[in-house]
């Protein structure tokens, strides 16, 4: 690798050719603040918070000092860089003041207060008052979506959301509109977000450094239900929530807080706190049964997983001709609600109309999913309210519960049994691996000793694997992120790729990187692979369990014995399966 000799703040360093000033400073252990920069996603130098002074060689001597944006400016041989002079600090402060001059400063009531990157930089640089007054850009609030709220009065035009939607997800429903001072981030033809092909994945939210984008807050609905003594209010927690909820309370990413999460939810007053891993296991049994039936009886292949509502809506918009390939299984969230309002309601003597079922999930698209058609096994919606990991964190704080001081507690019976296969649903490749653990045993007709299908693990955008099961070859593929889903499906259609079973998640890395997960600043996201760190919690949990196959879950067996009959039965299809819409563009 070619190396360059440079100086940073008077010290000599050697850095790889092609490095930016920001890369070089980071390798030297020097932090340069950024605001618009997201590594590999948004590298445009727009906010100018990362200003530094550089001198470049002009023949045998250094040229004059000038200011450049560190995030995009490449280093050159002999370059001298100054990262924190008084002139630089004042320039950064001035840029922050200019941003604030056109910004809604209702910080006390903003969802992003204390996690806002603009707020932190203003504190760091001593921005105490606004020296610039005058006209502000005309903005409005788009609250048409059931998942995502857009408030352009808090937008700083960093374009991180635009890059996440276009560059990372290859959807591009939002972009810069108008020119000059009137520029805002908007949709094509200024449509309401709900009327676009937005898939509600929420990657724009986790990319946003301010409160310009956030999930629709449904915490008041939950508290209202909890206060209604005529209602039976239950909650279930998705696999990945336990691996991220601690981040809301200062724990390092990658900390498993399942026990404290359960304890906190119980103290909020839910009648039952249940583990969604159980219906992840149930999903696997139904989905693998469906796959085997399609393979044996000439059904539509490849079959594609249906757990991710963002992916489902993407398919309905962009690949409507492939909706027949989708598994008809409801997601684990919807299956749980269906089981609660049919089997459990009957067992307890509850009227389904008196049950409020809440799901704690990492996903903003789940808010859209609860209102989808054909998701009402008992004649009422399977799930009433979906709250993100962030909303759960806010509910716990609002209730005055000291999360860190809580003891570890267990999920409530009878929905407390789950396998490691259900746990790994939260990571890309997890659904595929869980399904293979079941399908392989059915095809082989014997107990599977090796349950780790490591070929489908990892954060690579697209993964392929072929398994030879006593002469039966099963070809599988895994993709996460809609951009990668598009590439995979186009390859399947053209014949470039071949697979019988495909797992697709809308969010890159899967649910652990969902749009409803705790905020992490760009400084963390640019240096830590949060997807891998969070997924490791789930894989460690799986590896530590004796029960690692969905089909061996006693809770799932009991559901079939007492209520559903057999996997793929008529009753199972009535309660656990759904249909899709060809939305088109």
List each language-model region with its residue ranges.
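Iron-sulfur-associated redox domains of electron-transfer enzymes in respiratory
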Residues: 4-5, 12, 17-78, 82-84, ...
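Fe-S ferredoxin-like electron-transfer domains
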Residues: 48-200, 213-232
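A short, structure-level motif marking secondary-structure boundaries and short turns
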Residues: 5-8, 137, 146-148, 188-190, ...
């Amino acid at each position: 690798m070619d190396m360059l000799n440079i100086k940073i703040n008077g010290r000599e360093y050697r850095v790889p050719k092609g490095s930016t000033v920001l890369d070089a400073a980071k390798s030297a252990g020097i932090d340069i603040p950024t605001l618009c920069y997201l590594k590999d996603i948004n590298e445009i130098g727009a906010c100018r918070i990362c200003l530094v002074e550089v001198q470049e060689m002009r023949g045998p001597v250094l040229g004059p000092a000038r200011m450049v944006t560190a995030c995009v400016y490449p280093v050159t041989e002999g370059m001298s860089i100054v990262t924190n002079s008084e002139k630089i600090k004042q320039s950064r402060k001035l840029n922050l003041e200019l941003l604030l001059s056109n910004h809604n400063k209702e910080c006390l009531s903003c969802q992003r207060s204390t996690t806002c990157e603009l707020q932190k930089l203003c504190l760091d640089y001593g921005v105490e008052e606004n020296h610039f007054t005058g006209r502000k850009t005309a903005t409005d609030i788009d609250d048409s979506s059931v998942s995502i709220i857009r408030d352009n009065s808090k937008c700083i035009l960093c374009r991180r959301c635009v890059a996440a939607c276009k560059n990372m997800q290859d959807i591009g429903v939002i972009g810069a509109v108008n020119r000059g001072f009137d520029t805002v981030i908007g949709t094509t033809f200024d449509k309401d977000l709900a009327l676009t092909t937005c898939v509600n994945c929420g990657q724009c939210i986790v990319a946003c450094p301010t409160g310009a984008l956030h999930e629709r807050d449904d915490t008041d609905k939950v508290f209202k239900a909890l206060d209604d003594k005529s209602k039976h209010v239950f909650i279930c927690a998705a696999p990945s929530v336990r691996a991220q909820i601690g981040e809301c309370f200062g724990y390092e990413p990658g900390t498993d807080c399942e026990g404290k999460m359960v304890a906190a939810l119980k103290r909020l007053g839910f009648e039952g706190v249940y583990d969604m891993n159980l219906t992840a296991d149930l999903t696997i049994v139904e989905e693998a049964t469906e796959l085997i039936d399609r393979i044996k009886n000439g059904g539509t292949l490849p079959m594609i997983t249906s757990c991710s509502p963002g992916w489902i809506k993407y398919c309905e918009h962009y690949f409507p001709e492939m909706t027949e390939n989708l598994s008809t299984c409801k997601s684990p969230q919807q299956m749980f609600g269906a089981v609660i309002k049919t089997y459990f309601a009957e067992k307890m003597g509850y009227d389904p109309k008196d049950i409020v079922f809440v799901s704690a999930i990492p996903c903003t698209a789940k808010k859209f999913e609860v209102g989808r058609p054909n998701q009402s096994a008992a004649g009422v919606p399977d799930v009433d309210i979906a709250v993100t990991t962030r909303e759960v964190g806010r509910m716990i704080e609002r209730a005055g519960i000291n999360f860190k001081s809580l003891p570890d507690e267990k999920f409530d019976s009878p929905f407390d049994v789950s396998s490691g296969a259900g746990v790994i649903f939260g990571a890309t490749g997890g659904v595929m691996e869980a399904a293979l653990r079941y399908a392989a045993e059915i095809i082989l007709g014997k107990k599977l000793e090796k349950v780790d299908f490591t070929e489908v693990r990892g954060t690579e955008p697209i993964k392929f694997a072929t398994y030879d099961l006593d002469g039966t070859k099963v070809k599988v593929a895994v993709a996460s992120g809609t951009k990668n889903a598009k590439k995979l499906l186009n390859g399947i259609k053209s014949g470039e790729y071949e697979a019988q079973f495909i797992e697709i998640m809308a969010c890159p890395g899967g649910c652990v990187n969902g749009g409803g997960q705790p905020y992490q600043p760009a400084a963390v996201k640019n240096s830590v692979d949060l997807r891998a760190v969070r997924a490791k919690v789930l894989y460690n949990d799986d590896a530590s369990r004796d029960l690692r196959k969905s089909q061996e879950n006693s809770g799932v067996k009991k559901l079939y014995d007492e209520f559903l009959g057999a996997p793929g039965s008529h009753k199972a299809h009535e309660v656990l399966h759904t249909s899709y819409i060809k939305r088109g563009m």
